Every structure is written in C-alpha cells, then in structure tokens.
Amino acid sequence: MQRSKVPEDFLSLAGACGQERTFPMQKFYRLSVNIVKILTLLLAVFLFIGSFLTTCYAENMETQQVLLRFDNPLWNLLELAGYGLLFACCLSLSGKAGTKFRRGLLVFTLGLILLLGGMLIVFGRTVPAADALSVYNAAAEWIFGNKDIIHPTASYLSYYPQQLGLMAFLELLLRLWNLTGLSAPAWHFIKLVYVCLLCVAVLFQYRSLRYLWPNDWEPVSCCYLILVCCNLPMILYSSFVYGEIPSFAMLSVGLFLLLKLLADCIPAHSVETTSPDDTRVVGTSHALSAVTVFTALGSILFLTLSVMLRKNSLILIIAVLLVLFFEALRPGRSGRARIGLMAMAVCLTITSVGVLPLVQKCYEKKAGNTLSSGVTAMSYFAMGMQESSRGCGWYNGFNIDTYDAAGMNSDAANAISRAAVNERIAYFREHPGYAVNFYLHKHLSQWADGTYASRQATLATYGGRSDFLKEVYEGSLASAYIEWGNAWQNVLYLGMLLFCIATVRKRRPGNGSANAAANDDFRFRNICLYTYTGLIAVLGGFLFHTIWEANSRYIFVYSLLLMPYCAAGIHDGLVRLAAWRSNRTLTRHSNS
C-alpha cells in the first residue's frame, strides 16, 4: 500500500501563508528590541558622562547636604585603566585555569561578602534609624501585643501603610530571634540574615548569566564577580535594616526563574526558515510541562515578595510585564506558550498589586482596627519639584506636612499637592534656565553618587563602632571611600555603555581574520528582549526618579541590576581590544 503524497504546491502555499502571519510579528518584535537598544544606549551615554565628569557626595553627616564637584578626567582614566588591567588579568587566569578558577572566584566572592558583612556587624554597630527604626519598632510592638500600631491616625503605619510588608518580614525574624532567648539586640541577627540574603542575591544573579549570554557566560561571570568584590556600598547596605537587601534577593531569584523559563522551559527556537528579505523566522511546538509551570509560579512568588518588601520594586515588575507581553508575541512560540506567558503576566499583575493590600487587611483584621490610606503619591511628586537643604528634589517634609494639614484626608492632600505642582511648573516656565539646572542637579545627586548614600543610611550607632569605621563615616577615610565608589561607578556605567554599543553595531560577518570574533557580534546583536529586563527596569527607574522624591539610596538597587550588563560590556570590550591589537600586529608583520 502506497502512501499518498501531499502536492508540493500545497506545501509551498501553506508555508507562504504561515510566513505572511509570522513575518509582521517578527518585525514588530525586532522593532521593540531595537527601540529598547536605542533608549538604553542613550541612557548609558547620559549616565557615563555625568559620572565621569562629576561626583556627588556628602561630607557633613549631620546636614547630609549633597555636594557637587567636577572630576579630573585624567585621574578617572587612570582608575579605569587600573580596573581594565584587573579584569584582563582575571580573564587571562580564567582562560588558563578554566572552570576551577571561575568556581574558586565564586567561592572567594561569597566568602568575602560573609567576612566583610560579618566584620561590619561586629565593628560597625549600625542600628536602625528614621523609617527603618519605625518599622522595626512596629514589628517589635506587635509581637509584644500592642495592637495600637494599627490605627487610622495615631500610628506611623497610618502615614506609610506600604511598610506593612517589610514589618511582616521583620516580625518573622524577630520571632525567630526571640526563640533563642539571647539578650543581644535583634537587629544584629537581622543584619546577619541580610548578609546571607546578599550572598543569595549574588549567587542567583551569577547563575542568571548562563541564560543572559549562553555562549560567553563563563568569562562574563568572572568579570561580574570582580565587580561584586569591589562593590563596597553593597557591603555597607548589608547592615541597613530596611527593604533594599531582602527585596533585591527576592528579585534576583525571581529574575533567575524568569530567564530560565524563557530560555529553557519555553524557548522560541528549533526550526529556522528565511524570508525573501533575509528575516530569520523560528518555530517550535513545546508543551507546557510541570517544570515549566512550577518555574513560572516560583518566579511570580519571588517577584511578588520583592514588592511586599519594597514597593518601589513595582518598577521592575512593570519591566517584567512588558517583556512577558512581547515574548508572548514573539514568533516561534507555540499557542500554549503564548497563552501561558499571558496568563503569567496577568497573575503577576494581580499578585504584585494585591500583596500589600492583602497584608494590610490581615493586620487590620487581627487588630480589629483600620489604617488610613497614607501619604499620597502626588505629594511625593510635588516634593520632587521643590528645593531642599540636602539637594534639589530631596526630602523636605512636604509630603507628611501636607498630609497632616489636610487632616489625613487623601483628596484634600492631593488637591494641595496638585496646587504645589502647578505652582512649580509655572515657575519653571518663567525661569527655564533654573529648571534645567534644578533637574540636572537632581539627576546628578542621585546617579553620580558612587556611595549611593550608604554612609548616611548606616550612620546611626549606639556606640562601640571601631575607630577605623569612624574614619570611613566621618573622618579622613571618608574621601577615600567616596573616591572608591566613584571609580567603581565609572566602571559600571562604562561597562553598560560598551554593552549597549555592542548591541547596536551592525553585524559584519567574520572573515577568518584575527578580529573575526570581534566582528561577529551575533552574541549581542541578536539577543532576545528578555535579556534587557534589567536595563528596561533601570530605564523606568531613571524616568520615575526624575519626577519622584530624590535620593541616591533609591538608585542603589539599579546599580546592582546593571552589574551583569557591565560585566558583559567589559568582556566584549576587552575581546575587541585584544582582536584589534592582534590584527595590528599581523598588519605590521605583513608590511615588513
């Protein structure tokens, strides 16, 4: 019995119909990737120029006024050259020793974090202060049975109900500490937990490199670990009993699972076809397995926890939602995969938006009382347009004063804030030069501070701080710490810039010459949109903090998100430099 043959004309017609549907979607996807490439390149140029030419810092720890100085470009170039030599030596050792060196460097990095973080706990003696102390005390009072912290007016949480997520986390840690029966302050235990969470964050960000750049992740990971080892503000923030470190740890795990989901569980590759205009189309029919479902649920869980611990993480959630939407439309994904990614986006939206109200309802039900809606977002926008003793757009008390003046009525507070916004807009229109200077200083005070206000955030102590750390905070070593942070930040932004440049370069096919590897930038030019998740979040954070209350502490998490891209850019830059030198040597020999 002979099998019936399908006419070739029918197959050609079916393929053409499929391509008609696929190619517009492919172009739409590539257009979105190209837009992200251009915007992130512009941001990288802006950030690097600002950081390379200027430095913002605070000398007086009482007033904490942000000062601005112009840097010596030659000195900055010397510092960059020193870092470049360090990275080159690291890559050389990695090339010789291979996997053993990379694994040893990972163990060394995690050990260094534990060592320095532990030493900071013992000798730094940092204690919670300001908002951190208020949240800590609220958690402690709740454990002692004081339900008055849940009150519509007479409570810190009635002004800032978004802190309930962090309070719930601190309550858990305090209850665990109370089980030990030790009399030492619990915040030392919390700082130890934060050091461990910082190791978790670094480990999962390190593991994410395999999915970001599968071809070059090993040398890139070495550059990444060197960046981590040199990041002193990150160590100082491990003693900051607030939401930055635990939230970033949750973000790192959630993003790792997201990248694993998109790269491994439901990849969009397998069969390739080519259109008349040389557009590459890929197709696959992967089913959604149990591993895929649990990976997606895990990513949703940890990303949601990051929002619970720090509400500003919603900026990264928005970036993730955008990536999920465009990845669902990406050609090559099966119908099940598209539906699954869209369903994941819907679930993540619901959980990230609803987690804090849910926590609030739980506490209100236990206390038998309610909280007010809290200080309004509009008042923060208004405050971000005003002068402050610390800097342009920094905290000046307008938000809480407005909320009090309005009798803790959100509508009245919003009306006052809108009037203040309109007043400042009118003033900016009348004085455009002042407006440019205001927002330039606001930008630099946040993004050109290589310490990320780490000394200010961890300054408070009840005594016992070592003489060495006293000098770092307020003495002769403060300027050295500021310079160290400035140099590290210059490297961070330069690496980001090199990565963004590599992604927008036109592809030139390798010709077998010494610089063929440098010319063939397929590694970066054809990367997927999900690779840019961190950069999209940084772009969103840049726009948000331009209009929100200013503080360089808010930029700290974005600097951590940039480290993988910086490492990739540094590796690519060194590869191109080595190829250029090799090609130049060959040219000299051929001419002679």
Locations of regions flagged by a protein language model:
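Membrane-interface anchor segments at the N-terminal boundary of transmembrane helices
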Residues: F48, V66-A81, P185-C196, H441-V538
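Extracytosolic helix-loop segments that constitute the early lumenal/periplasmic catalytic or substrate-binding loops
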Residues: L133-S158, G165, S389-G397
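Short hydrophobic/aromatic helix or loop-helix immediately within or flanking a transmembrane segment
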Residues: N137-A138, S155-A184, H188
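Multi-pass, polyprenyl lipid-linked donor-dependent membrane glycosyltransferases
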Residues: I190-L197, C223-L258, S306-L316, Y554-S559
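Transmembrane-helix motifs of polytopic, lipid-linked glycan transferases
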Residues: L192-P214, V253, L498
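Transmembrane-helix signature of polytopic, membrane-embedded enzymes
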Residues: Q205-C230, Y532
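Membrane-proximal stem/loop segments at transmembrane-domain junctions that anchor or position
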Residues: E364-G463
